[in-house]
Amino acid sequence: MEYHPQAIRLCALIFISFYALLHLVEAQDQKGFISLDCGSLPNEPPYNDPSTGLTYSTDDGFVQSGKTGRIQKAFESIFSKPSLKLRYFPDGFRNCYTLNVTQDTNYLIKAVFVYGNYDGLNNPPSFDLYLGPNLWVTVDMNGRTNGTIQEIIHKTISKSLQVCLVKTGTSSPMINTLELRPLKNNTYNTQSGSLKYFFRYYFSGSGQNIRYPDDVNDRKWYPFFDAKEWTELTTNLNINSSNGYAPPEVVMASASTPISTFGTWNFSWLLPSSTTQFYVYMHFAEIQTLRSLDTREFKVTLNGKLAYERYSPKTLATETIFYSTPQQCEDGTCLLELTKTPKSTLPPLMNALEVFTVIDFPQMETNPDDVAAIKSIQSTYGLSKISWQGDPCVPKQFLWEGLNCNNLDNSTPPIVTSLNLSSSHLTGIIAQGIQNLTHLQELDLSNNNLTGGIPEFLADIKSLLVINLSGNNFNGSIPQILLQKKGLKLILEGNANLICPDGLCVNKAGNGGAKKMNVVIPIVASVAFVVVLGSALAFFFIFKKKKTSNSQDLGPSSYTQVSEVRTIRSSESAIMTKNRRFTYSEVVTMTNNFERVLGKGGFGMVYHGTVNNTEQVAVKMLSHSSSQGYKEFKAEVELLLRVHHKNLVGLVGYCDEGENLALIYEYMANGDLREHMSGKRGGSILNWETRLKIVVESAQGLEYLHNGCKPPMVHRDVKTTNILLNEHLHAKLADFGLSRSFPIEGETHVSTVVAGTPGYLDPEYYRTNWLNEKSDVYSFGIVLLEIITNQLVINQSREKPHIAEWVGLMLTKGDIQNIMDPKLYGDYDSGSVWRAVELAMSCLNPSSARRPTMSQVVIELNECLSYENARGGTSQNMNSESSIEVSMNFDIGATPDAR
C-alpha cells in the first residue's frame, strides 16, 4: 500500500491541531489548581485575573489567623490584581495555611510576596517559610521593591498540606498569593527531597515572560539570549510537547545556536556552595527545516561529565534530557556544554533549560491518624488556640499548646502521648476523637464544664496511665472496665453528679480493684475542712494587718494615681518593705536628668546614676508603654529587698511616685554576659576559664533562690542578658520581675501563666503551665550552650535553628571542634569542655524530673573549672573564687530571707 506524502502531512497536521486543542481545554479547566488571593474578604467572590485568566479565590477558610492589608497606591500600577492585597500576621510565632491536596502527588507550589509599604513603616519584613514541619526558605523583603516569588516542587505524603509563615524578628510575616498546581507524577522525580526553583529559561530574544495559559502547569519561563555568542532560531510550525513535562509550544518555538558553525554552545551558573545538589532539565526540539544532507548531532556534558554522547533533537517534537540522580559542581560553578560531533553539519541548539536545587525535608509529619484525631477534637470543642496551627508535634519549638509528643527521630512519624485541655472552657461530652489517639499516656480534661457520662472507650486506649476528669459535671456511673484497668490513675473529684462507688471520686489509683473508703474519707474530709478553714481565717487576719501597715509605709503615692497605672494597682497589694525609697526628684538628680543611657529592656530604659555623689547605680525606669507593669515592679522590689547574696544583683532602693516607677540597682560596670560573648563591648574575648567562673557564680545565685529561700523562688527568665558582670567580671543574676515562689511540702509545681524568653523557655513548662525550679535549670542549660558555642540561641540559617538541637546534631559527629566557639582557638581543656557539654544537655532533658538540680549543677561546674585550672589557664581580671557553694534548706519564714 502506498501513502501519498500530502495525505501524511495532512494527518500530521490534524493530529497536532487536535493535541493543541486538547491542551487548550486542559488549560481552561484549571483542574486541581488552588489559587488564593491572600487578604481578600471572606465574602468576596472568585474572579479571573485579567493578565492570566486564572481564577483566584479568597483565602478565608484556609487560614485561621492574620489581618488583611493592601499595598500602597504608588505600587499598584506595577503589579497584577492578585498581588494588590495581602494578609499579615502580627500575632503568634507560626501561622499556617492548610490545603486539601491529593496524596502522593507532585505539586508546583508558589508563594508571592509584595510588601508595597502596606503598613506605612518602610520596614520590609524578614521571616521563615515552612512546608509542613520543615524549613523551606527564609523570605527577606529588604531591597525587593518588585516583590519576590518562592517556588518549589514537592510530593505530598498526605491529603493535607500546611504552608506556614514563621516570625523570626520584630516584623510581621505577610503573603499576597499562594498557588498550587498538580503535576504529572512521572515528571520532576527525585531520589530524595524536594525541588526548589533556581532558574527556568527559554532561549529567545523575545523579552516576554511566559506562563499560564501557554503553560498548562503555570510555570513561569523567562527569556535569555546572548546576542554576542548565539544565533536565534524560530519557527511558526506546531510543536508536539506530549512528553509529560509539556513545556509550552511558544517556549519550544525558539532556540539558540552558536554563531560559529564549529562552535560549542555553553551555559554556566553559580550555585550557593560546592555541596549544593541540583537537578537539571534540558528541553530540545528541532525547529529548523533541515536539508537532505543536513545533520544536527552533539554531545551533552555537565562539568565534563557525559550526559549524552550523540544526541539529535526530534523534528518538531519535544524531548527532555535530565540526570536521574542529583548533581554537584566543584566550587559551585556549573558549566553545561553542547559540543558538535564530527558527523554533524549543524551546530548544537538549546530550546529551554530548568535547574532546581534539592531541599531535604528530614522531619516527618506527625502520625496522620493522630493529626486527624486532634483536629476532630478541635472541631468538637471549637478550640481556636493560636498555637494550634501547622503540624501538632513538630518542629518542637512549635509544639501545640497542651500536647506532648514522642518524637524518637526524624525517620519516624511523631505520635501524641499527652493531651492537656484543662481549664479550656470545654462543654458537652468527652469528644469521640480522643479514642483515636491510640498512643495517649496522659489525658487531662480537668476544670471544664463537661457533662454526660464517662465513656468506656477510654479503657480501650491501652497506653493510658493518667486520666484527670476532676472539676467537671459528669453524671452516671463510672464504667467498670475503667475501674478495673490496671496501672491507671483516675482523678474524678469535683463531679457532684457522678455516682462513685466506695468514695472513688476522691481519688482512684488503678490497682485492679476498689478499696473500701466510705468511712475513712468522710472523716478525713471533715478534719481537712476544719484545718483549711482555720488556716484561711488566720491568714486573712495576718494579711489584713500587714496590708494596713505596709500601705502606710508606701505613702500616699499608691492612692493618687489617675492613669492606667492606678487601674493596674487596684488589685495589687502594697509593696511590703520599709527600706529606702527615693522620690522622683531624687531620681532625676541622681541620673543628672537621665543623661547617660546604659541600655533598654522590656521594663524600660536603664540610666547611669550616682547616690550621694559616691555610689554608682543603675536606674531602671518603667516605661508607660512597657509590657511589664506594677506587678513585676512590686515582685522585683520585694524579692531584692529580702534576699542578699553575692551572686544576685543588689537593690539600692526604688521610686514609686505617681506614674514614675524606678528600680535602683548597684552598678555593674561590665554590662551583661551576652554583650561580651557577641563582642559588642569590645576588648578581649572571654577565655574558657573566665566563662566557667561566670557560669559557676551565676549558678550559685540561682541555686540560692531555689534552696536558700523559703518559700523557694523560680527566676523564670534566666538568660545571658540577665547575667551582669562587675568591674572584676564577677557575675550576678538580675531581673527578677517574673520570679515566682513554688510549693514545698511534697508538691512539685505551681500552675501559672507561661512567662519567659523564647529559646530559653522550658518546653515542658510551656506545654503544661506547671512551673518548678527545673524550668530554671532548662534555661541555664541554654546559657551553658551559649558560653560553649558563642552561637545565637535561635538562628534560622543553621541546619537546626535552636541551639539545643544544633548541638545535639553536632554531638552525633563526635567532634568538639564543631561545637566550641572558634574564637577560643582551642585554648581549653577538652575534658572540661566535654563535662560542660554533657551537663548542658542533661539540663535540657525534655523531662524536668530527669534534669539535675542547681546544687548538682554547681558541683559539676566546679569540677569543670578544676579540670581547666589544672591545665594552667589564666583568668581575665577575675579574682579566684571557685569554692563550691551549696545552700541548705533552713525554714526561716514565709518570705525569702538572707542566708
Swiss-Prot record:
Domain Protein kinase span(s) in chain numbering: 592-865
Membrane-spanning segments: 523-543
Membrane topology of this protein: Single-pass type I membrane protein
Record's signal peptide: 1-27
Residues recorded as bearing Phosphotyrosine in the entry: Y665, Y765
SUPFAM superfamilies according to UniProt: L domain-like, Protein kinase-like (PK-like)
Residue(s) carrying Phosphothreonine: T583, T752, T757
GO CC entries: plasma membrane
Cytoplasmic side: 544-899
Major subcellular location class: membrane
Name of the featured protein: Receptor-like protein kinase At3g21340
Organism: Arabidopsis thaliana (Mouse-ear cress)
